[in-house]
């Protein structure tokens, strides 16, 4: 039985003080309700350490939104995996569509980051997903499969990996894939993993859905057989909305 996982990606939102306030409220509610699902939050880099201290008692996992594939050096503005581990992170989100679309990250770059993060002992949330043009052209499976295969090149152990399917056209737009559309892609991802790593790895892999998940649609999405939780954007910035999604995840 796969344990559902819900992670809030705060993106470029909240000052350190605002992040501590939000994290405190989430930690208190998670600590009190003890949901069956795994819960994580990904604040901005400046807030990571303080948020980590705020939530460490609660069971809420600390996640980073990105990393570099080198340990250190002349990479202005970048943060390494060992820095994230030292800050208390257990997860790192890699290959998010905004990184791919806005910052030109290729499958090769994402793969280098994935390998580095896993080697550091971080758990990786690998994001994959198609644009609206790609969906309308009927190449969703081709695009997503390539992102999975190339993103995991030379990765032998995926036991600590999570994959997040995030259709680009449904991120921050208010549009959401139907539960059937999401399930179809999740099933395809699991099939790809089975071909790469075998039946056991595929059955144990957790695949999140990310794309305008909100309290009103979370339960029906999470009820699908291959959807194992959500990577939550805007709704994770509101305590009540985020907690409602966590409750829907079980």
Swiss-Prot record:
Domain of life: Bacteria
Species lineage: Bacteria, Pseudomonadati, Chlorobiota, Chlorobiia, Chlorobiales
Entry keyword set: Cytoplasm, Gluconeogenesis, Glycolysis, Isomerase
Name of the protein: Triosephosphate isomerase
Gene that this polypeptide is encoded by: tpiA
Localization of this protein: Cytoplasm
GO biological process, alphabetically ordered: gluconeogenesis; glyceraldehyde-3-phosphate biosynthetic process; glycerol catabolic process; glycolytic process
Binding of substrate, residues: 9-11, 172, 212, 233-234
Residues of the active site: 96, 166
Annotated source species: Chlorobaculum parvum (strain DSM 263 / NCIMB 8327) (Chlorobium vibrioforme subsp. thiosulfatophilum)
EC number: 5.3.1.1
